[in-house]
Amino acid sequence: MEPVFRTLEIAVSGATRAIGTRITYYGLENIPDRGGAVISINHTSYVDWFPAALAAYQRHRRMRFMIKTEMQDVKIVNFLIKHSGTIPVDRRAGAGAYAIAVERLRAGEIVGVYPEATISRSFELKEFKTGAARMARDAEVPIVPLIVWGSQRMWTKDHPRNMGRKKIPITVAAGPPLYAAESIDETNAAMREAMNTLLHKVQEEYPHPEGAYWVPRRMGGSAPTIDEARVLEEAELAERARKRAEREAKSRR
């Protein structure tokens, strides 16, 4: 029954209604109603997990997400991680989390993965890591491309939260399942192409005000271009590494 997960489902569904968020779903029949699958999700916001989870819920499935291990430092989040089947990932040593994810997939669960790893400031697809493709190959399960669009208006990098009763529309679209090839590069390329096609289709049907920060530059928005976003991310990573080095130096004193 998983009482904590059930409580989360009720709470998230209730909160979605309370703030007037309108979620439109497409292609949910592509999420299998039984058996394992990797759900490959684009990453544009801090809250795109909840429309993705609700999409699985529409299919009477519970999605197990992979989440960076630092989130365990937050007590309430750590409690939820332990009781919702979430898989913590140490980005510097992720083999253990990978093995758990493959085990869950083989056991018939669906695992949500962000192949971009971090939020895309450009709101375009970044380069993919190989984890999703490798999991699908090793567990012998399909990959379902899933696009979430609109949640970046609620809370994304470099911008304040916008979580009140704003009635922000969100679109969730699932594409046909893909099956992993022996070549990880080939699988990644096919997955990225499928997700990019689906993303563009969803974007074309969504209203985008000119100049809005959450709209990609190619669509008339003011979001960073892919190259500009890459520069920002490199600076962010460098600053994070500097702070980590400072902490480690202090701990050795």
Located regions from the model:
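A transmembrane-helix-recognition feature enriched in membrane-embedded lipid enzymes
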Residues: 1-27, 51, 59, 75-84
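Catalytic core of membrane glycerolipid acyltransferases/transacylases, capturing the structured
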Residues: 32-93
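Hydrophobic/aromatic ligand-binding patch that stacks against planar heteroaromatic rings
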Residues: 55, 80, 103, 134-138
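A charged, well-structured terminal subsegment
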Residues: 99-107, 170-201
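Catalytic-site beta-strand/loop segments enriched in glycine and acidic/polar residues
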Residues: 104-132
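A cross-family acyltransferase "interaction/gating" segment
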Residues: 124-189, 212-219, 225-226
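Acidic, Ser/Thr-rich low-complexity intrinsically disordered segments
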Residues: 214-253
